[in-house]
Amino acid sequence: MQSFMWIGFAAFFIASLTVGVRLVALWWRNRQLPELLIGLGVLGIGPVGFGCMTFGQILHGDYDTASRVVFGVGIFAASGGAFAKYVFNHTVYHPDSRAVRALATVAGAGLLACCLWEFSTGSSGIRDIGASYFIRTFLQVGCLLWGSIEALRYWRMMRRRTRLGLADPVVTNRFFMWGVGAGAAGVGTAIGITAQLLIGRPPLEIPWVTLSSSMHGLVAAVALWFAFLPTEAYTRFLLERAARHVQA
């Protein structure tokens, strides 16, 4: 069972690392802000943030000092990634909204304040579940679920245009997959933090929470991969399906 649980974590780590690096490399070539924001968001929350926090929990007990350092790096990385996703949601979906810009700014300030508080007090979310830990995780879940809703809303609009032959079916599907992936990551994180608050133990010490996180991570990994690294067969399927709908 333990080996099965780690499949989802490994898939999420590999997919988010590959996609994140690719998006940042794409930004380096074309200097488009959305690619940078989503790339940093994926890398920060995924392989760096999630990876370090998971490894920090594994080290806890035998190597407490190293555990806190590694977990702390994960906290800062995940918070930076979450802020990048808040800015992405504002830039891509509501670029002219002052209210959304203010929301992204407040979220970024909140994430930074929580990180600095936990760093200055030496607390962490491994065992120390304080207000800053709850707020930081809530903000992280918020950026994921908000991004999921926005992506799925955008997908619905573009799907109508695709049926008229006015939108790229591959790009349209990318929004759908991104919505599914972000939603899975957000729900998985929400379940984990809720269980930790109620039970008072790290998620990795609660078997059913570990399984839930692994399965949500697996869904997020598959969706992320098909969103940004679709296979030729899958791309061909999307194009052929769109062509049939246009002809009908």
Describe every region a protein language model picked out:
Residues 1-13, 114-153:
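Extracellular-loop-to-transmembrane junctions of the mid-late helices
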Residues 5-13, 68-81, 131-143, 206-220:
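Alpha-helical transmembrane segments of polytopic membrane proteins
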Residues 9-25, 29, 34-60, 77-82, ...:
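Hydrophobic alpha-helical transmembrane segments of multi-pass membrane proteins
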Residues 18-23, 83-91, 141-167:
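Alpha-helical transmembrane segments in multipass membrane proteins, preferentially the mid-helix core
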Residues 18-28, 60-61, 72-105, 119-123, ...:
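Internal transmembrane alpha-helix with an interfacial aromatic "cap," most often the third helix
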Residues 88-121, 128-134, 168-180, 243-245:
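The cytoplasmic-loop to transmembrane-helix boundary for the fourth helix
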